[in-house]
Amino acid sequence: MQTFLKGKRVGYWLSEKKIKKLNFQAFAELCRKRGIEVVQLNLSRPIEEQGPLDVIIHKLTDVILEADQNDSQALELVHRFQEYIDAHPETIVLDPLPAIRTLLDRSKSYELIRKIEAYMKDDRICSPPFMELTSLCGDDTMRLLEENGLAFPFICKTRVAHGTNSHEMAIVFNQEGLSAIQPPCVVQNFINHNAVLYKVFVVGESYTVVQRPSLKNFSAGTSDRESIFFNSHNVSKPESSSVLTALDKIEGVFERPSDEVIRELSRALRQALGVSLFGIDIIINNQTGQHAVIDINAFPGYEGVSEFFTDLLNHIASVLQGQSSGVAGAGDVAPLKHSRLLAEQAGGLAAERTCSASPGCCSSMMGQEPPWTPEADMGGVGAGSTAKLPHQRLGCTAGVSPSFQQHCVASLATKASSQ
């Protein structure tokens, strides 16, 4: 057993539904076997009374959204949480609240992806054009759509990327269909991808790719089809069987995602936001073979990730070891160590594939100043050309204070009314 873990304390706050779905008590038991004390936090009490805490794991997405709606109880919970973080910059937070707010806003997360792709300059990546609609469609809507590179058919999603309603989407095929769009929302070009979605589940330096069913191909351009309304969660369930996912035939390119591309995208998001627990939805354009990021999720469900608890514990051990050895200073973003590709083929699960990243594996991301650093756009959580830590704990170095990090993220993060 790694002796440096003994006596460490990990606090967590998850909804009861999330705890049951993940069977998080099993993770707590796994931690205890390694000498780590696990504490379920009660945000209705001062966190100070429940500390000290070396690590906090949370999914406060519901609470943050309620606070943004001026719910007094949620505002108090978020304030109490932030107050503890500000008072204890040594505590590792998985994941920072400003980053979570960015991922809760599809418009902002899509803009971040656009900047990351422009920085990476990788022809294998080309996510669809998007645009935010803040008012009902009017006479100039078509002009705005065209100016932003959008063309029929396109997919319409809620701006908020969390909650039951966030899965309610529509495919619009013509101008008449615009009348049913309810702002605020984000519209995104629909890319044919042979009805296959790849869900990338990231835990620190590890990630697992799981194949899921997705929407079938549709003809490009305007058509007289009526808009299709659907729930993306239902469509992309592992066992989903729907007329929307029934592919008549495979068209054009049918390729697997590149492990290298996924590794660099994951690493770039970790660098830009300082997140450790997130999911990326990727499709492969059946005309070009390019990877397209169509959504990013904070602390997803990790369905199909059999080693989630092991990966999470290893990540916690890694960041705690870095903290205790003094190597967790600014400037280090370790390349992703391995991935597991659990693609569900017609005959069942494909064999697990592991990739160990060498120091040069992500060379295209090294030695360049990314556009999301403060000097470039005030959109990231770094300073100058300094790369941020994979776990990006708030105030993890003397040179980066919590208030400065929050300021740096402000142009991309959704600001809650509690702040």
Swiss-Prot record:
Q: What is its EC number?
A: 2.7.1.134, 2.7.1.159
> Where is 1D-myo-inositol 1,3,4-trisphosphate annotated to bind?
18, 167, 199, 297
The alphabetized list of GO BP terms reads:
inositol trisphosphate metabolic process; necroptotic process
Q: How is the cofactor bound?
A: Binds 2 magnesium ions per subunit.
Residues where Mg(2+) 1 binds: 281, 295
This enzyme catalyses: 1D-myo-inositol 3,4,5,6-tetrakisphosphate + ATP = 1D-myo-inositol 1,3,4,5,6-pentakisphosphate + ADP + H(+); 1D-myo-inositol 1,3,4-trisphosphate + ATP = 1D-myo-inositol 1,3,4,5-tetrakisphosphate + ADP + H(+); 1D-myo-inositol 1,3,4-trisphosphate + ATP = 1D-myo-inositol 1,3,4,6-tetrakisphosphate + ADP + H(+); 1D-myo-inositol 3,4,6-trisphosphate + ATP = 1D-myo-inositol 1,3,4,6-tetrakisphosphate + ADP + H(+)
Residues reported to bind Mg(2+) 2? 295, 297
Instruction: Report the InterPro entries cross-referenced here.
Output: ATP-grasp, Inositol_tetrakis-P_1-kinase, InsP(3)kin_ATP-grasp, ITPK1_N
Residue positions where N6-acetyllysine is found in the record: 388, 415
Q: Which domain of life is it from?
A: Eukaryota
Residue span(s) of domain ATP-grasp: 117-325
Top-level EC class: transferase
Q: Which Pfam families match?
A: Ins134_P3_kin, Ins134_P3_kin_N
Task: Spell out the protein name for this chain.
Answer: Inositol-tetrakisphosphate 1-kinase
**Originating species:** Bos taurus
